[in-house]
């Protein structure tokens, strides 16, 4: 778990451009022995409480607002359209029909940077929170079942950190290595 105090955060009134600056700075300053941040937590201005998060995918998706026309979560509450496994031909048809990514990337990025993070952020669902005292198996189950890249860790009602899939994977690799080492009595 990465403590909340060590994670990239922005106020809800920040622009997407400001949020990306914070993420870049956090990546530069983060301990080089660990994985870099891949998301930004959005905090309520008055209370400082986490109200959302912005992943790298959220940022990229926000560059092309036309995705909202057919990937709206209201139409597909669990996953949007992203998990249906469409054919390459169908995907290309959508790209052309909605004229996605037709403008130069430089122009798209310039417009998107002015967006407010409240309009881009993902509001975590109940399945994206895990209690601080939950065992690793429970957290792994939530990550797998929800296809989540991270979970917000809570202590009572407060968010105290973020448990990232990359950290869980690293721990699994360490434990696998230990499990495959011969014990002291074996040779």
Regions found by a protein language model. Give the residues of each.
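Short amphipathic alpha-helical molecular recognition features
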Residues: 8-11, 51, 128, 160
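Residue-level detector of functional hotspots within protein domains
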Residues: 26-28, 45, 103-106, 116, ...
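A glycine-centered beta-loop-beta connector
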Residues: 23, 34-57, 143-146, 151-166
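Non-catalytic interaction/Regulatory regions outside core domains
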Residues: 1-4, 14, 21, 53-56, ...
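The conserved cystathionine-beta-synthase
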Residues: 10-37, 63-64, 129-147, 172, ...
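Tandem CBS (Bateman) regulatory domains
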Residues: 1-6, 56-128, 140, 144, ...
């Amino acid at each position: 778990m990465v403590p909340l105090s060590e994670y990239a955060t922005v106020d809800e009134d920040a622009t997407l451009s400001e949020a990306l600056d914070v993420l870049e700075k956090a990546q530069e300053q983060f301990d080089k022995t660990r994985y870099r941040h891949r998301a930004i937590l959005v905090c309520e201005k008055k209370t400082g409480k986490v109200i959302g998060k912005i992943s790298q995918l959220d940022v990229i998706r926000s560059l092309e607002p036309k995705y909202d026309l057919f990937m709206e979560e209201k139409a597909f509450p669990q996953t949007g359209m992203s998990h249906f496994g469409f054919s390459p031909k169908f995907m290309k048809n959508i790209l052309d029909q909605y004229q996605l990514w037709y403008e130069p990337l430089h122009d798209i990025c310039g417009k998107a940077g002015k967006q407010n993070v409240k309009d881009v952020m993902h509001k975590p669902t109940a399945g994206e929170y895990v209690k601080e005292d939950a065992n690793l198996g429970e957290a792994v189950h939530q990550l797998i079942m929800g296809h989540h890249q991270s979970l917000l860790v809570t202590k009572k009602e407060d968010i105290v950190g973020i448990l990232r899939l990359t950290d869980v994977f690293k721990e699994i690799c360490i434990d696998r290595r230990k499990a495959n080492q011969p014990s002291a009595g074996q040779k």
